[in-house]
Amino acid sequence: MDYDNMVKTLEILKDVVNALECADKGNFDKALEYLEKAQKVDKDNPLVLYVKGIVLKLKGDMEKAEKYFECLENIEGTSLLSLGNLICLTFVKGEYERTLKYIEKLSRLSKPCYLSPFHKALIYIEFGEFEKALEALDEFLKIYPNLTSILRQKASILEILGKLDEALDCVNKILSIKKDDAHAWYLKGRILKKLGNIKEALDALKMAINLNENLVHVYKDIAYLELANNNYEEALNYITKYLEKFPNDVEAKFYLALIYENLNKVDDALKIYDKIISNKNVKDKLLIKSSILNKARILEKLGKIEEAVETYNKAFDNNI
């Protein structure tokens, strides 16, 4: 390198260092000024282009950041650093086909890079292509076999696909790595519920809520299972806690009415069924018809036959 080129390189490095210092302190505009100064010396300098892309990304200007990473990719032919950033940027923008194109290129060049299988899995989940998502997650797990967040994602997909035994094995692996993972316990309870293992499902769901009391939605699952298990007082306790947080959940109110029925609090049950039936915002026709039929059954038991028959007839109204 001759003297002039050496001076030019040092000037560029000085501007890049200054830009990095400014960017590190959040002064992105000043950082960009230094980088533009460096570009006047060498417009297509790869280091300047890369740092400029990073600064623009941090500043939130995704379009311009992407432009510089693409420019660097074109100049260099192959830039792994640019590919990694292009994957993230196009994914955030929802341009999944482009993301997959960059993923394919990066995965050929750097197999251990987690970005490729991770984003690929998320895209296939978005597309509803769950088998392909599983393949991508398995690629990821070859690199990091004990990463519980990825194992959880895999277990959830297996559950969606109805592969419940495999999903349960996956959750059990998570719990062998991290026994206090509240979401994994919730997932286990949900899967066991689908497998018909009520007692084990309840144990798992209660463990989840003990580990993280903010998982309020779990109260509803527990209430449903306690109801199915004829533990009505327990069911009442959990559904009440749930409805304190989500008072407008109509399905949960329906469970509450069923619980009241089984506790012989028929007046309370009837009030809830009437509210569900008269609620114009309820779109679930099955829930409305079930409420009408349950109301009719109660009226029949109370000896109010004429009112019961009238209510039964409403259940067969096609306008419901």
Curated annotation (Swiss-Prot):
Assigned keywords, A-Z: Repeat, TPR repeat
InterPro entries, sorted: TPR-like_helical_dom_sf, TPR_rpt, Ycf3/AcsC/BcsC/TPR_MFPF
Top-level taxon: Archaea
Keyword Hydrolase attributed: no
Pfam families: TPR_16, TPR_19, TPR_8
TPR repeat residue intervals: 12-45, 46-79, 80-113, 114-147, 148-181, 182-215, 216-249, 250-283, 289-320
PROSITE patterns found in the cross-reference section: TPR, TPR_REGION
SUPFAM superfamilies per UniProt: TPR-like
The UniProt record lists the keyword Repeat: yes
Name of the protein this chain belongs to: TPR repeat-containing protein MJ0263
The species this protein was found in: Methanocaldococcus jannaschii (strain ATCC 43067 / DSM 2661 / JAL-1 / JCM 10045 / NBRC 100440) (Methanococcus jannaschii)
